[in-house]
């Protein structure tokens, strides 16, 4: 691979250029307008995708990893917040004093706000910063929102006995993380090869689970401090995570779709080539660029996208927007944040003296389960993952809630809890998290990232993701009140939501495994019934076997197989 650009400075010029590897003599303007390649260039044959060995796969994942690390930011907040609400010094700084007990405590309102203010910021940030992706490029936009995230962290660290200052910092902190929640999956979906797109977008969720796990570990390590280091150290570590993303953006290729929209065709070819480690003049690269260019030109003929365009029935953007909103809404209504936000509190209620340790166990299950999802999501399909996830989580939640209601307190709420029932609840919580982490957690982001045409993508993704954060706020804020009133009956509410999720996916969500982003648009436009969509073949490939069959031929085990010689 040729050397990278020598300048380490982060600015709009070097972040908006992905021509860091090779100088390319671009085709003439007529060739660009008519297509990037023709039969004479490729001898009348459709170019094949580059063959990858283990090293080829490794390079792709390493190049995409800094983008996916944006998922670490909201995960880290979930992990540390779950510990903060049970820390003595944190309650002393931001809670109220109870004279009858001589202890500090967090009221339900303040606890709910502490957990939920981050989600408010994320919801606003996702919509507010999405436009930067179209004006400044995906990479520079990510750097900007990460800087906003750092400002929020500074405000939180400097808070001292002023809970309102801490909450303002939490909102600004969320603005940056919310921007990442839209921009990072967007960039991942646009630079990922079609056959690896699901796994690469899943890396965002993998890093979110990694953030939750390390967040749990950090508060476990600082819980015995008696001063403000108890909570300031975990917040201060945010600067390290932000720095990783900012430096990583110097290495990641820019979105070829964004570059082609800006008429920077040769840079788009270099961006595509960088991912698969081939020449920018390779016929496969030119074919990919041609397909993207055709899609961009088709969208351009329809005129500049407006917010009104999101409600278009003719192009079925409205249908896809509703799908994106509901999938992101259902992601929260699985009940996963019931465990992640209030994990330490829940497990203290079932008789465990150290809920921090149990939270680390749950974080470990969550992280390693998501690794499985990254490896298999492009082999199984989106619909199957979501349907299996909804059914299996429903079974686990029914058992969890039933044990909590019927068996946990055999002598009433004021009596001692049953250790056996508490242990059983922890086991089924682990099963639940496994089912969630391997299905809905990564696939919900994949569905949203690949559903929308590039013309309205930033707007549609920002609205869809905003609903994720809105529901996370509602669940985070109201859970203390609801559990205080109905206790473990709360689980049955999520069971009802899981039933609705299963039915919606079966009847309304099409399968997009093995399709390029441009082919996904054709799938929606042709109006294929979702339960028949797995066998749909795009016009350019009709006469061949179904894409689902072809995808399955490439077993994920190939990724782990060491060839005799690396690419």
Swiss-Prot record:
One of its GO terms (molecular function) is fructose transmembrane transporter activity. Residues 77-112, 161-170, 219-232, 354-359, 406-427, 487 are extracellular. GO terms for biological process: carbohydrate transport; hexose transmembrane transport; mannitol transmembrane transport; sorbitol transmembrane transport. Residues 1-19 have a biased composition (Polar residues). The keyword Transport applies. It is found in: Membrane. The chain crosses the membrane at residues 56-76, 113-133, 140-160, 171-191, 198-218, 233-253, 337-353, 360-377, 385-405, 428-448, 466-486, 488-508. Residues 1-32, 533-555 are annotated as: Disordered. It holds the Pfam family Sugar_tr. Keywords: Membrane, Repeat, Sugar transport, Transmembrane, Transmembrane helix, Transport. The keyword Membrane applies. GO terms for cellular component: cell periphery; plasma membrane. InterPro entries: MFS_dom, MFS_sugar_transport-like, MFS_Sugar_Transporters, MFS_trans_sf, Sugar/inositol_transpt, Sugar_transporter_CS. Residues 545-555 have a biased composition (Basic and acidic residues). Its main location: membrane. It is a multi-pass membrane protein. Residues 1-55, 134-139, 192-197, 254-336, 378-384, 449-465, 509-567 are cytoplasmic. Probable glucose transporter. Belongs to the major facilitator superfamily. Sugar transporter (TC 2.A.1.1) family. This is Hexose transporter HXT16. It comes from Saccharomyces cerevisiae (strain ATCC 204508 / S288c). The gene is HXT16.
């Amino acid at each position: 691979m040729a050397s990278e650009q020598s300048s380490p400075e982060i600015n709009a010029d070097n972040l908006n250029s992905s021509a860091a590897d090779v100088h390319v003599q671009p085709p003439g303007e007529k060739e660009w307008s008519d297509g990037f390649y023709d039969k004479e260039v490729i001898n009348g044959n459709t170019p094949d995708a580059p063959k990858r060995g283990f090293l080829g796969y490794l390079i792709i994942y390493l190049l995409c990893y800094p983008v996916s690390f944006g998922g670490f930011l909201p995960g880290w907040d979930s992990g540390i917040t779950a510990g903060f609400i049970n820390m003595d010094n944190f309650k002393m700084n931001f809670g109220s004093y109870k004279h009858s007990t001589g202890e500090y405590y967090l009221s339900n309102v303040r606890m709910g706000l502490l957990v939920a203010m981050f989600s408010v910021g994320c919801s606003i940030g996702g919509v507010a910063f999405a436009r930067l992706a179209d004006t400044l490029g995906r990479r520079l936009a990510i750097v900007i929102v990460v800087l906003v995230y750092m400002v929020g962290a500074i405000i939180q660290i400097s808070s001292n006995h002023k809970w309102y200052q801490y909450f303002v910092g939490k909102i600004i902190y969320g603005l940056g993380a919310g921007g990442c929640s839209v921009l990072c999956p967007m960039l991942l979906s646009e630079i990922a090869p079609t056959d690896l797109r699901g796994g690469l977008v899943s890396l965002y969720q993998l890093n979110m689970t990694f953030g939750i796990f390390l967040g749990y570990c950090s508060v476990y390590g600082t819980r015995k401090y008696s001063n403000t280091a108890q909570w300031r150290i975990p917040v201060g570590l945010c600067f390290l995570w932000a720095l990783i993303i900012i430096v990583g953006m110097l290495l990641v290729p820019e979105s070829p779709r964004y570059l082609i929209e800006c008429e920077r065709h040769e840079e788009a070819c270099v961006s595509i080539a960088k991912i698969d480690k081939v020449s920018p003049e390779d016929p496969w690269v030119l074919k990919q660029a041609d397909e993207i260019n055709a899609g961009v030109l088709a969208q351009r003929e329809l005129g500049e996208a407006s917010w009104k365009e999101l409600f278009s029935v003719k192009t079925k953007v409205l249908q896809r927007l509703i799908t994106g909103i509901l999938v992101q809404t259902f992601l929260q209504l699985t009940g996963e944040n019931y465990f992640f936000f209030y994990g330490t509190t829940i497990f203290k209620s079932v008789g465990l003296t150290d809920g921090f340790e149990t939270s680390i166990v749950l974080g470990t299950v969550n992280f390693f389960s998501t690794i499985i999802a990254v490896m298999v999501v492009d082999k199984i399909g989106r619909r199957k993952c979501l349907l299996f996830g909804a059914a299996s989580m429903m079974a686990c939640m029914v058992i969890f809630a039933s044990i909590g209601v019927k068996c946990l307190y055999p002598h009433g709420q004021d009596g001692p809890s049953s250790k056996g029932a508490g242990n059983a609840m922890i086991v089924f919580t682990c099963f639940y998290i496994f089912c969630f982490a391997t299905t809905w957690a990564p696939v919900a982001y994949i569905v949203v990232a690949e559903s929308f045409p590039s013309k309205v993508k930033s707007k549609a993704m920002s609205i869809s993701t905003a609903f994720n954060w809105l529901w996370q706020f509602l669940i985070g804020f109201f859970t203390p009140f609801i559990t205080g009133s109905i206790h473990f009956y709360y689980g049955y509410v999520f069971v009802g939501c899981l039933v609705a999720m299963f039915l919606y996916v079966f009847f309304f969500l099409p399968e997009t495994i093995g399709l390029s982003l441009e082919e996904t648009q054709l799938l929606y436009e042709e109006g294929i019934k979702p339960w028949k969509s797995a066998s749909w073949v795009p016009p350019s490939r009709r006469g061949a076997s179904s894409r689902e069959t072809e995808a399955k031929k490439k077993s994920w085990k190939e990724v782990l197989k060491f060839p005799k010689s690396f690419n």
